[in-house]
Swiss-Prot record:
Entry keyword set: Chloroplast, mRNA processing, Plastid, RNA-binding, tRNA processing
Record's GO cellular component terms: chloroplast
Any Pfam family the entry gives: Intron_maturas2
Family as reported in the entry's similarity comment: Belongs to the intron maturase 2 family. MatK subfamily.
The keyword Secreted is annotated on this UniProt entry: no
GO biological process: mRNA processing; RNA splicing; tRNA processing
Organism per entry: Pinus rigida
Subcellular location: Plastid, Chloroplast
Keyword Phosphoprotein attributed: no
Function: Usually encoded in the trnK tRNA gene intron. Probably assists in splicing its own and other chloroplast group II introns.
Annotated protein name in UniProt: Maturase K
Alphabetized InterPro entries for the sequence: Domain_X, Maturase_MatK, Maturase_MatK_N
Disulfide bonds: none
HAMAP family: MatK (MF_01390)
Amino acid sequence: MDEFHRCGKEDSFWQQCFLYPLFFQEDLYAISHDHYLDVSSSSRPMEHLSSNDQLSFLTVKRLIGQIRQQNHSIVLFVNCDPNPLADRKKSFYSESVLEALTLVLEVPFSIWSKSSVEGMNESKSFRSIHSIFPFLEDKFPHSNSILDARIPYSIHPEILVRTFRRWIRDAPSLHPLRSVLYEYRNSPDNLQRSIIVVPRVNTRFFLFLWNYYVCECESILFSRLKRSSHSRSLSHGSFPHRTHFHRKIKHIIIFSRRNSLKSIWSLKDPKIHYVRYGERPIIAIKGAHLLVKKCRYYLLIFRQFYFHLWSEPYRVCSHQLSKNCSSSPGYFLRVRMNPILVRTKMLDELFIADLITDEIDPIVPIVPIIGLLATEKFCDISGRPISKLSWTSLTDDDILDRFDQIWRNLFHYYSGSFDRDGLYRIKYILSLSCAKTLACKHKSTIRVVRKELGPELFKKSFSKEREFYSLRFSSKAAARSQRERIWHSDIPQINPLANSWQKIQDLKIENLFDQ
C-alpha cells in the first residue's frame, strides 16, 4: 500500500481517475488476506481457525473475472460462500474482498488527509478526546444555548455512492462498492432497506464508511455555513481517520439574501462551538435566541437537501444551559453560577467585591449507572447488591480483579465531577456484590468471606485512590481539594458504560417523540 500511496502522491490524476485497475492486482488481495488473518487471530484463538482460511489465488482470479464482466445480477460474494453478507458468520472470502475494497477506497482519502494536515496548523483544528472535557470547561460556561444534534446513521446506498463521486472520478471503481451496499441493503436481516452506518460495527469497511460519512457531513456543513455567512473562523478541516475533534467559529455576520444591500443582521460577538464525541455532536452557541433557531433550522434543511434525509425535529433539540441539562459524554452537563469572593486593596483601604462567574458542573448520573449495573446482574432495580453467578466459575483473584477494574473505571471516569458522593453508593454495591459472588462460589456467607479477605477486598483500587489524593492534596488544602476536579488521561479506554448510558438516553428520547 505504500507503493500505491507513493504513486498517488506523485500523480494526483492517477489517484483520482484510475483506481479501478487496483482491483485486478493479486497483491492487493494478499495484503487484505494478511490483514484479515491478523485481525481474526487477535480476536479468536489459533486453534479455532479452520483449514479453509487460506488464500487461493484461483478464487481471487475468478472474483476478478466477475468484476470484469460488470454483471450486477451476480452477487459478488455468492460464489465464495453460500452464506449472505449480512449473516453473522461471514465467509472468509467476503471479508477478504471487503478488505481489498476498503484498501482501494482508503488510498485517495489518506493522501488527501495527509496533504490537508501538512498545509494547515493541525493543533487549531483537531483535538483528541483528552481535550474534550477541558474544552467543555472553557467554552460551555460562556455559552447560553446548546444544540444537541445527533448524526443520522441511516442513509440510502445510492446517496452514499454519489457522495463518493465527489472524491473519486473513476466511476467503475465504485461498482464493487455499489454491489456490496445493495447486497447489504437487500439482506433479510435489514428491515429498514437502508445502510445503517454506525461506528460500533467492528469491521474496517464499516468503520471507513462511518469516518467518510461524518467527514462529508461536517465538511459540507461548515463550508456552506461559511459561504452563507461572513465569518472569521479558525482554520479547520475534516479527517476521515479521526473521530474526535472540535471546531470554533466566531464573529459571524449573516447577510440577508433578499435585501443584501439594505438589511444586514449583525450579531454582537456571537460564538459557535462545535464538539463531537463519537456520533453525538454538540453545538454551543452564545447569542440571541433567534440565532439558535436559525442554526437548528439550518441543520434540518441541510440534511434534507444534501443527503435527502428527513430528520425528525427531536434529533436536533435546543435548550438553555442555565435551565436544562445536556447528557454527553456520560455526564449530565449544566452551567451553574459560582460566586467568588475577591479582596482588593487600594490606597491602604480594603475593598471587598463579590464576583459571580459561570462554570460547567458535570453531574454523575447515579440512577442510570445503577440501572446499568442491574442490567449486568450486579444488583436489582432498586440497587440491592446480588451475586454475579456467571463469574462463580472463575478464580478468586479473577473475581477480585474484575470488580476492582469496574470500580477503578467508574472512579476515574467520573472524577471530573465536583459531587462524587453518589459514587460511594456504587462502591457499596460493587463491594457487596463481590462478597456475595465469592460467598456463592465457596458456599459460605458474606461474614466469612469478609473475615477471610479483610482488607484484600478492593484493596488495589481503594488504596491507590487514597494514596493518590493524599499525595496530591496536603492537609492545608483539604477544603480546596473538594472543589477541584481531575480528568484522567485514560478515559478513552474506560467509556463503554458512558456509551451504553448515552444509547439508552437516545432511545428514551426517540420513544418519547414516537408516542
